[in-house]
Amino acid sequence: MEIIISNWWVIILVIVSLIFVKNFSKKSKVDIKKLIKEGAVIVDVRTEAEYNSGHIEKSINVPLGDLTYRIGEFNKEDKIITVCAAGIRAESAKKYFNSKGYNATNGGKWSNIKDII
């Protein structure tokens, strides 16, 4: 009981985080589905080997390390969805795209997006 009392803020933080993640996931799936219907470009930032082991049909493989010199391949008017194995590299790619004036969204795990399509 003493541990719970002394760490009450950690418990509250975990609960709030779980609520946020649950709500974010629901919202993002709807948004991603809409973006795909609108013709968004899906950019898979996993390595070539990861991509070759399974990927979303019509997605473009640009490993995260190559993005800085391949970004010119994309049109700034296109909506972009970044994906990877867990969502972490996709977030980095999204931030990079957006910092260069593109309209990018982190799609998270490629396998989750594949299930929505």
Language model: regions and residue ranges:
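Rhodanese-like catalytic fold shared by cysteine-dependent sulfurtransferases
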Residues: 2-31, 38, 48-79, 88-117
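Short hydrophobic beta-strand that contains or immediately precedes a catalytic carboxylate
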Residues: 41-45
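Short, surface-exposed ligand- or partner-binding patches at beta-edge/loop junctions that are enriched
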Residues: 83
